[in-house]
Amino acid sequence: MPTKKSIAFVTNTSWSIYKFRLYLIETLISKGYSIYVLAPRDKYTAQFSDLPGVTYIELTKFKGRSLSPLHDLALYRELLHHYNRIRPDLIFHYTVKANLFGALAAARARIPAVCVVTGLGYTFAGKGWLQSTVKILYKRACRKCTEVWFLNEDDRHFFTEERLVAPGRTFVLPGEGVDSVAFFPAPFEPGKPAVTFLLIGRIIRHKGIYEFVRAAELLRQQGLAIRCQLLGFYDDGNPVAIPRHKVEEWSSRRILTYLGHTDDVAPFIEQADCIVLPSYREGLPLSLLEGASMCKALIAADTPGCRTLIEEGVNGYLCREKDAEDLAKKMAVYYHLPAAAKRQMGIEARDKVLAGFTRERIAGIYLQKIDSLLARPVVSGTSAITNS
């Protein structure tokens, strides 16, 4: 590398940098890149802000769930100011607002930029003015991007079918990558008195938590010896948040056990038998990757992102979306498997992770793509780069 290149990562929380991209950043630094991280400050900022090779820039205008055009304009101006000041060679944007307004700011500054669509979330879950507005903004932003990346084929198909982005300027990244060493399987324990099903995710409706609770009720009515556990943080400001009193009610009725929130999920996965995620839509869920890496069978909804990891009857099962009865059936199928079949299902799950979803593989893909992107000429007036 003749000159030291700089890469900027822009997102809505420092937590997401720490959780999903810290290994990638460390890898890029080891290859000679200098790194900028632009994100709001939170308790996770210190996990990376002092790393040699990282320059942290606090974003103060990021109002994640605000619908105010004034807030969005302030964010655009803040990003444009920083981009003109630091002049990175390439920018990666993550999450909706960073993608929308970061892409426009990067284009104005004439800096190549990639929008990474990590999942469509509740914004695209319904039909209404919000979805229509976001689609219009995404169409404009995607025109300004060098490339638009997705974590699954379904999301890419949605964007291209809606003509938000040209197919030739898209790329599917197979997830954020999992640490297969930290998430290493414990010895299989046959003959447990109860089968433990664990759901890891934010406490919001779109994770399929209501369906999980109803499935637990149905299985208990059948007399099955099960434990259903929920691990994740309350997302109180989210429009589809589940009220705390509902979780407390489920716990008091012993339908499920709420385990709270932790940054170290491995011990909880280790104690579980099967990881469940009946989510309505995902990018590529890390909870399933981490569970699979620890040789746990998977049960998830047949929805974008979730279906990517699961081979029916091989490493887990898919249930119909928003269908608690079908979820209960698939959980019952797993429950009744012989111990040897459960063990083999877990082995198959880890093998799939090792074959294509480790953090080392994802970092390698980034390195190849970055080399390619930086080699392209910038089109005058935008951050789009010719690739035709």
Q: What spans do the regions from the language model cover?
A:
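A conserved mid-protein helix/loop that constitutes part of the nucleotide-sugar donor-binding site
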Residues: 19-23, 195, 202-218, 325
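Short, structured helix-loop element that forms part of the nucleotide-activated donor/catalytic region
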Residues: 45-49, 157, 222, 227-254
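Donor nucleotide-sugar binding/catalytic pocket of nucleotide-sugar-dependent glycosyltransferases
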Residues: 57-58, 139-185
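Short His-centered aromatic/hydrophobic patch
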Residues: 93-99, 117
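Aromatic "clamp/platform" in nucleotide-sugar-dependent glycosyltransferases that forms part
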Residues: 261, 280
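Short hydrophobic beta-strand element within catalytic cores of glycosyltransferases
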Residues: 297-300, 310
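Conserved acidic donor-binding segment of nucleotide-sugar-dependent glycosyltransferases
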Residues: 312-313, 317-324, 333-339
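A short, well-ordered alpha-helix in the C-terminal region of glycosyltransferases
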Residues: 326, 340-356, 365-368
